[in-house]
Amino acid sequence: MGKKSLAEQIADIANKPQVEDFDIENDEGVFQHGGSDSDVSSGDESEEELKKQHYVAVGKSKLRNVVDQGLAVKDKKYVGSKGSRAELFNDEEMDAPEQGESESEAESGSEESDAVSFRSDSEDVSESEATSESEIEKDREEDEETAMKKEKLAKIVQTQTKQVINNLAHSAQRDASKGYAILQQNKFFDKILDSRIKLQKALSASNQLPLSQQSWDELLDENNSKLLTSTFKVLEKVLTQCVTVRHKFQIGDHINQSENPSDFDNSKKRSFKELVHETVTLDSDLKSYRSAVLNKWSAKVSASSGKSLLQASKFKAINQSADVQVDNQLADMPRLLKRTKLNRSNTKPLLFDEDLQKGLLKELQLEENVEGDIEEENNLDIPKNYDPRRKDNNALDFTQNPYIYDDEDFYRVLLNDLVEKKISNSQQSNGVTLAITSRSENKLKKNIDTKASKGRKLNYSIQEPIANYEASVNTGYKWSDEQIDEFFAGLLGQKINFNEDDELEADTMHNEEDEEIKNDDIQIFG
């Protein structure tokens, strides 16, 4: 094969693959591929040699010669210290007790060698035994001290565990007593609500009683009088029992500190007025104690819940103490009393209309408003409580009756709380909730006509008939019958002549003129 040209050599170099291909059937190629590691290593060495070809040959440095010859250490700190064999053996015995056997074997070998070394070895052994005994005693003492410390620690731990158990038991007992007291309070409150619910019917029925003494006398008979006397006796008995219980309770809890238990006489018979007076005094004595208790427990509850830390919301009514909330609710007493006089159930006392007509119900009469508006003073025919939106504008508005007591809104709130509490206790797993809504017929709604706006309907009220009224009579001047007849005839467009003679003469003259006209011999139109 001839020599390749320059172009062929350049083409071979350019077309040479980066990864060399190996033929499987070529054994030499496979063998060369298997020994590629050695070739690579030899190639690396040759590459390193090629890299160092330009280096200049340099001999060893002075430091290297010193290291090869060995360092001549002349400083004292590098010189070792001499020691005896006894010290060496003592150190070895302290480090490991098993080395004693090897030392004894070495000592026996040394005794066979020479007597001088035997004497020195025996002295060393005696010294080591003495030191070992002292160390054993020290170890025993240390073990005893550690045992004593452990016993003391165990006793301290036992006493502390007993104290913790006792504290837990006392805290559990306190918590149990508090829980029992709360349960008893809830039961007592439920009983009070139950009695209040039972009294609601009697309270609503009492609003139907007569209002005046005349109606009482008219409706009262023997059976009713007997029933009244019996109920009055029962009421006095219940009031006396309530007063005695409250006296015992307040004296026992040191609420009434001025009184003694012996000063209160249960056997003394009191009148109804005296019982009412005693209840008022008991309420006044209980007020300060109640406010203190409410303030105490509300502060504890707010501290446990973290509400006291929220300074931004302390002025809200719900974040104030319980006694302050109660005082705020009772501050506007006229408004609360006015709400109790609203006739929500539309009850009407017996003989109410008769008493109203007779003027026996003074509180329901219309009062003159001296500071009224000028329009009301000018329009005297319009009642003061006139409302054009109402369907029936009577002179009196009976939706607010001062002779009744109706707290149905407060009663329904209590009833709703009681029922929700019962349901939550009995059916917690089911999560059943009940919302009690008052009936629409029991709600107080104003009788307003919604179609009377924008002039679509003209509302009016019929004026009541005026009593004891008579038109004035002027006796100074009277009309005659002729004037009256002429006046009414003139209204109807007629004219009446009351002179009959003149009328007859006029008739005769008229007849004569007619005859003369007929006989005048003048003929018109043929």
From Swiss-Prot:
Q: Which InterPro entries match?
A: AATF, AATF/Bfr2, AATF_C
The answer on whether this UniProt entry bears the keyword Cell division reads no
Superkingdom of the organism of origin:
Eukaryota
List the biased-composition ranges (Acidic residues): 89-114, 123-145
Q: What is its main location?
A: nucleus
Q: Where is this region: Disordered?
A: 16-53, 82-149
Show the Pfam families listed in the entry: AATF-Che1, TRAUB
Q: Name one GO biological process term.
A: maturation of SSU-rRNA from tricistronic rRNA transcript (SSU-rRNA, 5.8S rRNA, LSU-rRNA)
List the record's Gene Ontology CC terms alphabetically.
nucleolus
Q: What keywords are annotated for this sequence in UniProt? A: Nucleus
Coiled-coil features, chain-numbered ranges: none
Give the UniProt subcellular location, in the record's own words.
Answer: Nucleus, Nucleolus
Task: Describe the family membership recorded for this protein in Swiss-Prot or TrEMBL.
Answer: Belongs to the AATF family.
* Protein name per its UniProtKB record: Protein BFR2
Originating organism: Kluyveromyces lactis (strain ATCC 8585 / CBS 2359 / DSM 70799 / NBRC 1267 / NRRL Y-1140 / WM37)
